[in-house]
Amino acid sequence: MEATKTDLRLLLECLKYQMKWPGSQKQALLTIISICKQNDQYVEFLREIGGISFIYNLSKSSTFSQVKETALFTLASLAELHESCKQALCREEMFRDFVQHLEQEMPLTEKRVAVYMLSVLVANNRCGQTLAKTSRCIEALLRLFRQSFPVPGESYEQLQLWITVSSALCGSVNNPQNEENQNVCMSVFPEIKPWLQEVALPRAELAQPLCSFIGMTVANNPCAQEYFVSVGGLDSLSDTLTRVLSQSTHSASVCKMATIITKTLSACISNNELLGSSLSKLRVIPGLLRLLSSPNLDPQDQLAVVLTTGHLTDACVEQQSQLLSAGGLPIIITLLTETSDEELKKAAIFVLHTCNRITESLGPGMSTIDPNECDREGQWRSAGQILQRIQLLEKKIGKKLWERDPESQPHSMKRSDSHVECDDELWEGSVMRKVKGNHRVYGEFRAIPAGTPITSEILQDQDSLQPDSSEEGLSPVQVNLFKGPNWEKSKKRKHKQKRENERSDNQETRREGVNKRELKRNVKSERVVKRLKMMNLESDDDGYELLQNCSTPTEGNRDTQGPDIFRHPDPVKRNQREPSLSDDNMSLCTELLDKEINKFLKPPSASKSNTLRCAGCVKHMNELNSRSFGAVLSSCRFQCDFHLTLREAEDRFRRSQPLKRTSHTPTHTHINTHRKIREHSTSAQEHKQKSKREKHKLSHQSSDRCYRLTPLRRPRETYSPDVKQWTDHRHLKKSSEDARSKNSSGRHRKRQNWSDKELCYLTKGVKRFGHSWNTILWKYPFHPGRTNVDLAKKFYHMQKAKAQGVDLSVAKAL
């Protein structure tokens, strides 16, 4: 970085000392731009060393045109790269210099670079917009905008200058919106009206800058919108759009130009229904529908076309009739069902929602509509077919969702009707107003014969036959399209009847739940028994196939052909493991137990309902193992079927084991006490070994009545020296316990002096673990027979001897 900063200093010196060489200065300026584009810190460094000020002075004082152009372009590029540089250049004197610069006679390229510099300073900058107005720079730009409009046959540089001026004006009035500058710029609307008539295929390059300026100036400004309409600009824009839309299906460039004009039209009529209703005579809706169905339309531009259609249909009923007569409903609904863009879906629903008054236009107002343009029965038939398509698509989407992730769906089996709530906020009437809607997804739709005309009476009959076909039974679009004339009268009655049905359904659901719980208490689960029995089928090929293909029994009788398509699938056995080839059925039972414990003792998540029933189900995995399992279940008054079966198996296992009896004979004072103790210890060891052999033999018997509930103990690895030292230490501890049991008949243990190593172990242990005597005893290899009390007393004596100044060698015998 330091080397780059040195290069910037050298380039700045080159600019200062090469005043007579414009080529060298131009190359130095372009090199500065390329360096500063690498890192924003270089722009800040150049500003600190005075490079920005020098380049600006060079743009004013240089006598070479190419140096002025390059200097202005360098300033614009640096301001675009760094915000602090832009704010440093935003001074009123600089804007006044720009005004003088634009009014002078200069080459078109230099003037274009100056306008580009000005557009960078006002873009996304409230301070720059204000300075452009106070310094009368906007007036200079408007004069240049009028004078530089390219007539046919002029040079390409003239067109580029006019496009740059339009961009600078757009930045001064919007982003952020500046109403004062908008009111100043709308004075050029009368000159724009004839320009709109020249926007056609031969001069398609005029559409983008001209429409951008109009859209930015009238956006969210009712005063500018009304003035644009008063000078005839809206009519001229609509005529241009109608003329271009007729050619949109033949050329992609014309389709792009039509999209640009459509966006401008939407900005001119947004939030103003009166302006939208004035366009009904021009019949813009059919042209927009042709544009929407054009194969040349970019999918990214569909949103603007649909929004403009929604603004027009929301303005008046006549344009809704135009939408219906031109076949707009199938196009909009097809777009709604096939697109994956959420914003486009909202816009399509907004268009359909604005057609809620279409029934009125089809009813009393039919006399004012040409019968050749609007076939009522044909449109109803078309709408019915579209409704069937929507519901078929909903079925397919629902099946895909269930197949993709059935566990993430809500548990709706307890309810008779599955309804999905849609919380998306939709535009209604205008961009600022919003509406919410609910819809219920149906599993079946009673198909109507294609030859039968679908009228409002037929739809009313369907509503009477289907108690759920109310406003909650259909989507907001379907409700608005298929409301009959008597729908409002029966709405309250249907809501009242629905509430009564919901109360009765809730009571029946509660009674069914109580009955099911009573049945579950009295009937054992056959599912666990089948799983345990299937473990013995591993040697049978048929049993192996059965184990691979089996699934857990379902709860209740469910009709797979029922109308409720959005229902939970039957629970299946996931991630099924192939049967092990081990001959030890006890280890298989242990693996099954661990698997079921992991399954039932998972912490409840947000997407699954809490179905814990007993202490075995409630305990977490770190609180429960195969040894504490029986104690936990015995403390619970009620066990589920699964844990009750496991507890019975454990009881059978414990009853089959031989009772371990340890006889403790009273000690008497006798000469041969030690000899009898040794004999007793020998007999106890023999009995213990015999019991182990019997248990090992019993564990290898293939019996269905006895199962091992604890995993087989694996031999410890003794390869590392730490493990070996720990094993030796445990062996020493065991021998010390045997020694204590052998000497338990006497009153005192044999006295053993403390070695130097033991004292060292004790000192290190206290430093490391404090007064945790048990930890110290098990951590270090003390002499067999030492206890935690011995360690505590010895440390106390050591501290006492140390305080009295006694040598620790003497304290060994304390």
Swiss-Prot record:
Disulfide bond annotation, renumbered to this chain: none
Sequence ranges of the ARM repeats: 93-136, 327-368
Protein name: Telomere repeats-binding bouquet formation protein 1
Protein family: Belongs to the TERB1 family.
Compartment(s) where it occurs, according to its Swiss-Prot or TrEMBL record: Chromosome, Telomere; Nucleus inner membrane
Organism: Danio rerio
UniProt keywords, alphabetically: Chromosome, Coiled coil, Meiosis, Membrane, Nucleus, Phosphoprotein, Repeat, Telomere
Gene Ontology biological process terms, A to Z: homologous chromosome pairing at meiosis; meiotic attachment of telomere to nuclear envelope; meiotic telomere clustering
Keyword Repeat attached: yes
Subunit structure: Component of the MAJIN-TERB1-TERB2 complex.
Residue runs in coiled coils: 488-512
Sequence ranges assigned to domain Myb-like in this UniProt record: 746-799
Annotated Basic residues bias: 689-699
InterPro entries: ARM-like (IPR011989), ARM-type_fold (IPR016024), Homeodomain-like_sf (IPR009057), SANT/Myb (IPR001005), TERB1 (IPR042359)
Predominant location category: nucleus
Function: Meiosis-specific telomere-associated protein involved in meiotic telomere attachment to the nucleus inner membrane, a crucial step for homologous pairing and synapsis. Component of the MAJIN-TERB1-TERB2 complex, which promotes telomere cap exchange by mediating attachment of telomeric DNA to the inner nuclear membrane and replacement of the protective cap of telomeric chromosomes: in early meiosis, the MAJIN-TERB1-TERB2 complex associates with telomeric DNA and the shelterin/telosome complex.
